[in-house]
């Protein structure tokens, strides 16, 4: 009798252990996506799109936060934060896949691959950018792109995808040599969805976009670039590939990299449209979860907060609706490039362009003081003595910075910096084992909990 009872208890425990092991794991990382970015998007979703339901991530049953400090700073960079989320180890800013004393540490993706999981990583920026690189590379500096790609070629993952490689920003010839190395290590290298669909791809794919604005950017959602690859399409392509080559179990990381780029530029409208698009990518995984609810885990978080974005500003609109946001038809980056291309514009021509692209004077009221401020800076820009606003990814005319400062103020959106902050970031989860993420997390705990759930620890 006692023996039978022990056997029954043992069988029950084994059943619980088996049930607690997710087979399909999705980790979504909104680069730079603080709670302010999420709430601005939720406000837009509710007041402009008139949706009664919250954005999908905010519907998940687990909602928590994570601290993001690095080993050497209260304010992390993407390399240290990516390493924390990938490996469960704190490191110094700029370091990839290593401890502060330069000891290489494996990511959960590498460990899961060794246990037979398929692995896919996709991003809206370069596939060798800091966050995705932290899952496969081990380098002392995030800018060591050739070395990062050497690690990538040997990682054995099933899908790496993004806008392109940072190496191509300096040398297309070196980029081709890097692609050849991936091919030599068994990857099928494709440029665009058409090539992917036509290729008889093997188990490993390196995907780059043939419509990318730069090798580090597929393009902003707000710019509505005709025919441009979207992160939602890339997420679907990666998922389809994993279902084909590793149908029994896989791990997938999706990074919304353009959220960070837009936030560095303090482009409130672009941030909201990027987070809204990121939510569509989450929907791809959620639809899969609905088919496999007892086997799937979805986690959503961010590597850090960029910009310190807020809904509400000093002396801003008393009744924030964000309805003006749909007047914005161009990102701050593209508007800046537009200004550079049209240096011969008169002020009246620029006013007409701002009316068309931003809604100024037509749908968004501009007072005399605001117009005078913009015109003064516009005149300096035409005379080439305009000061510039420098951020991590872009250098803007002061005129552009002033225009978008006024635009954000009209929205009721504020920013505290063009850099990162030390603010905690949101954590949302649903599915098998999601309850593990319900308490306040340190970012290193997220991969540690995935290890525990998959019996890697």
Predicted features and spans:
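A post-motif C-terminal structural segment
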Residues: 23-24, 33-39, 43-83, 129-133, ...
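Surface-exposed patches in mature extracellular/periplasmic domains of secreted proteins
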Residues: 97, 105, 119-124, 191-194, ...
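Mobile, glycine-rich extracellular loop/lid and propeptide segments
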Residues: 23-40, 85, 90-91, 99, ...
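Positively charged n-region of N-terminal signal peptides that target proteins for export
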Residues: 1-4, 282
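Residues that line or immediately flank small-molecule/substrate-binding pockets and catalytic motifs
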Residues: 12, 126, 164
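Glycine/charged-rich beta-loop-alpha catalytic/anionic-binding loops adjacent to active sites
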Residues: 92-94, 263
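Hydrophobic h-region of N-terminal signal peptides that target proteins for export
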Residues: 10-19
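Short coil/turn segments at secondary-structure boundaries
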Residues: 3-4, 73, 96-103, 136
């Amino acid at each position: 009798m006692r023996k039978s009872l022990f056997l029954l208890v043992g069988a029950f425990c084994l059943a619980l252990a088996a049930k607690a092991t997710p087979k399909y794991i999705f980790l979504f990382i909104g680069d730079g996506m603080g709670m302010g970015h999420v709430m601005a998007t939720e406000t837009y979703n509710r007041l402009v799109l008139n949706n009664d339901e919250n954005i999908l991530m905010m519907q998940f049953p687990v909602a928590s936060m994570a601290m993001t400090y690095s080993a050497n700073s209260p304010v992390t960079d993407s390399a240290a934060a990516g390493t924390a989320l990938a490996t469960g180890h704190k490191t110094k800013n700029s370091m990839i896949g290593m401890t502060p004393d330069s000891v290489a540490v494996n990511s959960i993706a590498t460990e899961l691959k060794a246990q037979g999981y398929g692995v896919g990583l996709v991003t809206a920026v370069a596939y060798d950018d800091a966050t995705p690189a932290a899952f496969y590379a081990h380098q002392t500096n995030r800018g060591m792109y050739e070395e990062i790609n050497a690690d990538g070629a040997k990682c054995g993952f099933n899908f790496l995808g993004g806008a392109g490689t940072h190496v191509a920003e300096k040398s297309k010839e070196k980029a081709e040599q890097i692609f050849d190395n991936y091919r030599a290590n068994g990857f099928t290298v494709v440029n665009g969805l058409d090539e992917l669909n036509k290729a008889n791809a093997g188990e490993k794919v390196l995907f780059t976009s043939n419509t990318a604005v730069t090798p580090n950017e597929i393009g902003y959602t707000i710019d509505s670039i005709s025919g441009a690859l979207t992160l939602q399409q890339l997420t679907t392509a990666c998922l389809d590939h994993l279902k084909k080559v590793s149908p029994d179990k896989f791990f997938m990381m999706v990074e919304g990299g353009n959220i960070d780029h837009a936030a560095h530029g303090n482009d409130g409208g672009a941030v909201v449209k990027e987070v809204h698009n990121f939510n569509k990518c989450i929907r791809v995984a959620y639809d899969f979860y609905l088919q496999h609810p007892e086997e799937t885990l979805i986690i959503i978080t961010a590597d850090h907060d960029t910009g310190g974005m807020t809904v509400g500003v000093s002396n801003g609109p008393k009744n924030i609706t964000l309805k003006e946001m749909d007047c914005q038809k161009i990102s701050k980056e593209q508007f800046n490039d537009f200004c550079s291309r049209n240096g011969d514009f008169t002020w009246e021509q620029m006013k007409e362009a701002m009316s068309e692209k931003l809604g100024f004077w037509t749908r968004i009221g501009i007072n005399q003081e605001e117009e005078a401020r913009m015109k003064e800076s516009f005149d300096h820009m035409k005379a080439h003595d305009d000061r510039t606003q420098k951020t991590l990814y872009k250098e803007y005319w002061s005129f552009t910075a002033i225009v978008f400062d006024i635009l954000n103020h009209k929205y009721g959106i504020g920013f505290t910096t063009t850099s990162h902050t030390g603010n905690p970031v949101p954590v949302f989860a649903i599915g098998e084992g999601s309850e593990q993420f319900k308490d306040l997390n340190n970012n290193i705990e997220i991969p540690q909990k995935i290890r525990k759930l998959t019996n890697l620890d």
